[in-house]
């Protein structure tokens, strides 16, 4: 039980670090590499698995996937990425196409369970 509690604390600390990195900047490539490392360690290599299964995803697609997996809203993502809400809506639409999701499949649910 102690191990589980320690693991939860560790995951929480990593989450806080990731959020701090995102708030500072996600546009700097070095920061993105660090974010990716933290994200993969807390989400069972999510990005690696996603990249392996869907090799045509762009870096921007992967960023959106990570932010959606963190359960951020479209508005929050737009604010973090310094773009309009409409731009994120369009990226989500294109991402659904690249992931070949059915019309009734929720993008966030898909990413949470991936």
Regions flagged by a language model, labelled:
Residues 1-6, 10:
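Single conserved hydrophobic/aromatic residue that forms the stacking wall/gate
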Residues 15-16:
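Coiled-coil dimerization/phosphotransfer module
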Residues 20, 25, 29-114:
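Cytosolic nucleotide-binding catalytic cores of signal-transduction proteins
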């Amino acid at each position: 039980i102690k191990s589980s509690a320690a693991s939860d604390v560790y995951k929480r600390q990593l989450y806080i670090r990731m959020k701090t990195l995102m708030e500072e900047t996600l546009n700097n490539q070095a920061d993105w590499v660090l974010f990716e490392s933290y994200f993969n360690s807390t989400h069972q290599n999510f990005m690696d698995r996603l990249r392996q299964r869907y090799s045509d995803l762009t870096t921007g697609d992967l960023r959106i996937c990570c932010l959606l997996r963190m359960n951020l809203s479209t508005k929050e993502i737009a604010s973090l990425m310094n773009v309009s809400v409409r731009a994120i809506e369009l990226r989500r639409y294109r991402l659904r196409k690249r992931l070949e999701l059915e019309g009734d499949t929720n993008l966030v649910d898909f990413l949470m369970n991936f």
